[in-house]
A protein has these predicted regions:
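Extracytosolic ligand-binding ectodomains
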Residues: 2-384
Length: 384
């Protein structure tokens, strides 16, 4: 059913695989072949912990529901999905994208072969050679976890294979005349910033930590308000007194916290310690996480608004992602990847199936709603 591979090598088709009795241990490749051949009971009997989280999660799922797992599978033949991963570039997002794709296909009982192509980096020759290999092996649909550097290698792409890029928004691409078969899936940070500014006053300030994402968010705020004051927080220690002396008071300011969750919690608590009363605290998707509720004080959250574009309604999909140790309800990369996989599956691979999502695709970009949220005692609630 699923073939997750770490090398760009050909895999024998399922119909040519025949298990043989052996006293030798079934290694990771052997276990993956058993999965591809739908020999689930053989997989369970041969499974030995390989310190492979992917295989361990599948083992747990099969162990709990082996009867239902193979029941009423969609009978689709010769259907394949490629996943292109520059693992040295996107690092931890690699597993997120692979796992969310597989979790979605499991939720649909889809009999689809998945193959992962690792490119290492996004160098021009590696992206191009991988695309050629993917197409040569007959794949018509691919999820490609590319950054802007990788997408720049697709300027001249003219193939018929449909490519979904969950990691980038189309607005970030500077060149025009992009192949219509390339679709973008990132959330829209510009739309989130605009929605948050509707809750702000004219005195805008922003905190950052110097990271690429933080700097990117700062630039988006600055585009909307040229008078924004910036406060940079680096390292583990926060010298709040020095920041205030150098940049001025934050009383009655609308403060964007373009910082990771732990620093956001620290900054919000320091505002309280220094008896600073902002007009409002604001954050984009970067801080929309269940951990936000435990790291911040309830009093600090009363005047804190977060923008969120994740709107998952499928409990089974949430459960399957949790098996892979990730949350589709808070991880926008997992959510975007799931929407892209859903698009391929329901629009092309199995048109009789229903989409699990409300989002639409327009001009080669997923359109997301922006919901403004507040953290209560134990959950997030949408502002009305």
């Amino acid at each position: 059913v699923f073939a997750k591979e770490q090398k760009l090598v050909d895999v024998k088709p399922a119909e040519n695989f025949y298990p043989k009795i052996s006293t030798q241990e079934c290694d990771s490749n052997c276990l993956l072949e058993l999965l591809e051949a739908r020999l689930y009971l053989s997989f369970l009997s041969e499974f030995v912990d390989q310190h492979d989280q992917f295989l361990s999660n599948i083992y747990a799922k099969l162990l709990n529901s082996i009867t239902d797992f193979d029941k009423n599978l969609q009978k689709i033949t010769s259907v394949k999905l490629a996943i292109i991963i520059p693992e040295k570039t996107i690092k931890s997002y690699s597993n997120t994208i692979i796992n969310s794709s597989i979790a979605y296909l499991l939720s649909q009982r889809a009999e689809i072969k998945v193959k992962v192509f690792l490119t290492g980096t996004e160098d021009n020759h590696k992206i191009r050679s991988t695309l050629e290999q993917v197409q040569a092996q007959g794949y018509q649909y691919a999820i490609a976890a590319l950054t802007l550097k990788g997408v720049n290698q697709l300027k001249d792409y003219s193939g018929d294979m449909k490519i979904f890029i969950p990691t980038l928004h189309k607005n970030n691409v500077s060149f025009s005349n992009l192949n219509k078969n390339i679709i973008f899936g990132s959330i829209d940070y510009d739309a989130q910033v605009l929605a948050l500014l509707n809750k702000a006053n004219s005195d805008i300030a922003a905190f950052s930590d110097g990271s690429m994402l933080s700097s990117n968010l700062n630039s988006r705020v600055l585009e909307q308000n040229a008078n924004t004051r910036f406060y940079r927080v680096e390292g583990e220690k926060l010298d709040f007194y020095r920041l205030l002396r150098s940049q001025g008071s934050l009383n009655n300011a609308s403060i964007f916290l373009n910082t990771p969750l732990i620093k956001t919690a620290l900054i919000s608590s320091q505002l309280r310690v220094y008896n600073i009363q902002p007009f409002v605290l604001l954050s984009t998707q970067i801080n929309y996480n269940s951990t936000f509720l435990s790291l911040t004080q309830e009093g600090d959250r009363k005047n804190f608004i977060l923008a969120n574009s994740i709107d998952n309604h499928d409990d089974n999909l949430s459960y399957l992602n949790e098996i892979f140790n990730q949350s589709i309800d808070y991880n926008w990369i997992a959510y975007a990847t799931s929407i892209g996989t859903d698009y391929f599956y329901t629009q092309f691979l199995n048109t009789k199936s229903d989409s699990l999502f409300d989002e639409k695709i327009q001009n080669s970009q997923i359109l997301y709603k922006v919901r403004l949220m507040k953290g209560s005692k134990a959950s997030f609630e949408e502002l009305k």
